[in-house]
């Protein structure tokens, strides 16, 4: 997958309950948003920091 492909994926919180704060790119708004990730499964549209999300997606 390319960065563009990952950034266009919808955020998936996954089925677990770890409640980890992450950032994901919202292709509809063109912004990275803070969301809660469950800690397992999900997809590549998940970044540890806002800066990582912006670097990968907001400027592609």
Curated annotation (Swiss-Prot):
One of its GO terms (cellular component) is extracellular space. InterPro entries: Kunitz_BPTI, Kunitz_BPTI_sf, TFPI/VKTCI-like. Residues 1-2 form a propeptide. The keyword Secreted applies. GO terms for molecular function: serine-type endopeptidase inhibitor activity; toxin activity. Disulfide bonds join 7-57, 16-40, 32-53. It is found in: Secreted. Residues 7-57 form the BPTI/Kunitz inhibitor domain. CDD domains: Kunitz-type. The record marks 17-18 as: Reactive bond for chymotrypsin. SUPFAM superfamilies: BPTI-like. Keywords: Disulfide bond, Protease inhibitor, Secreted, Serine protease inhibitor, Toxin. Expressed by the venom duct. The cysteine framework is IX (C-C-C-C-C-C). PANTHER family: BPTI_KUNITZ INHIBITOR DOMAIN-CONTAINING PROTEIN, KUNITZ-TYPE PROTEASE INHIBITOR-RELATED. Belongs to the venom Kunitz-type family. This is Kunitz-type serine protease inhibitor conotoxin Cal9.1d.
């Amino acid at each position: 997958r390319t960065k563009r492909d990952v950034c266009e994926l919808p955020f998936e919180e996954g089925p677990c309950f770890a409640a980890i704060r992450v950032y994901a790119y919202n292709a509809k708004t063109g912004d990275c948003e803070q969301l809660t990730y469950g800690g397992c499964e999900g997809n590549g549209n998940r970044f540890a920091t806002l800066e990582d999300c912006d670097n990968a997606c907001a400027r592609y």
